[in-house]
Amino acid sequence: MQFTGIVKFYDADEGVGYIVREPDRHEILVRSSGLALGVEALYEGDRVAFDVNMGTNAQARNVMRT
């Protein structure tokens, strides 16, 4: 299932950040390994679409700007 959200924070040096999922405002962890091909970094305020790896620690994957 694909979700949308807004990047709350992303540290390109560390390769980690958070996306605020819409509409429930849940914060989802994103790592550089979860970025879609061609996306090298995210920036605060970017609107994104992504899938969620539903495990113990939910993480965004296939993250792309919209």
PLM region spans:
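Short acidic/polar mixed-charge low-complexity motifs
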Residues: 1, 24-26
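Structural detector for short beta-strands of small beta-barrel domains
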Residues: 1-13
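Short aromatic-glycine-enriched beta-strand elements
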Residues: 14-19
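Short acidic, glycine-rich loop/turn motifs
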Residues: 21-23, 52
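A short macromolecule-binding patch
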Residues: 26-33
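Short nucleic-acid-contacting surface segments enriched for D/E, G, S/T with interspersed K/R
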Residues: 36-49
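OB-fold/S1-family single-stranded nucleic acid-binding modules
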Residues: 53-66
